[in-house]
A protein has these predicted regions:
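Short intrinsically disordered terminal tails
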Residues: 1, 90-95
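Short terminal alpha-helical segments
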Residues: 1-34
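Residue-level detector of intrinsically disordered, flexible termini
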Residues: 6, 48, 71, 93-94
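Short linear sequence elements within intrinsically disordered, low-complexity coil regions
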Residues: 13, 20, 56, 81, ...
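Amphipathic protein-protein interaction modules
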Residues: 32-87
């Protein structure tokens, strides 16, 4: 299910590794995918991009790879892990 562009912008800025990433603001998933596949310089950035792209269109095969929650949680630093866990808690409470 696609969410609004504003929702993705709001979520994207919670992941510091994506602050200057192309495709986050304004939201452009194709641009973010290319950046994550070719130019992202650390695991925080790649896993954060994969997470957003998976939320946007889960069935698509993104160039940067599929989001793996277990791998991301192991690789993310504390700030990025917290951003994900905060999102997960909000989604759980909304259901």
């Amino acid at each position: 299910m696609k969410q609004s562009d504003n929702a993705f912008l709001g979520l994207g800025v919670k992941f510091p590794a994506l602050n200057d990433a192309p495709g986050v603001a304004p939201w452009n998933p194709n641009q973010l995918d290319i950046w994550a596949a070719e130019s992202a310089d650390d695991a925080n950035a790649v896993h954060s991009a994969r997470f957003l792209l998976n939320l946007w269109m889960p069935a698509r095969e993104w160039q940067c790879g599929r989001f793996d929650m277990n791998e991301a949680i192991q690789k993310w630093d504390r700030v990025h892990r917290r951003a994900f866990l905060d999102w997960a808690a909000r989604e759980t409470n909304a259901a």
